């Protein structure tokens, strides 16, 4: 017989660090070349004029300018395109 009650264990207690995804530069903001505009998983936002796409789908400015967003219809799914206007 146990003198004290044994404590159970749980299979919880883990949580991943947040990945800080989302829009980093909004429409109308001035950005420099190389600035990160959007961090994303997949292509919710598509690269437009003067915008490049990294291997993790991050969008970044190729030239200095002002950020602008436009809505496009593609494959029955509304997407947004990000441009950097000089």
From Swiss-Prot:
One of its GO terms (biological process) is translation. One of its GO terms (cellular component) is cytosolic large ribosomal subunit. Residues 1-24 are annotated as: Disordered. One of its GO terms (molecular function) is structural constituent of ribosome. Keywords: Ribonucleoprotein, Ribosomal protein. Gene3D superfamilies: 2.40.50.100. The keyword Ribosomal protein applies. The keyword Amino-acid biosynthesis does not apply. Belongs to the bacterial ribosomal protein bL27 family. This is Large ribosomal subunit protein bL27. It comes from Prochlorococcus marinus (strain MIT 9312).
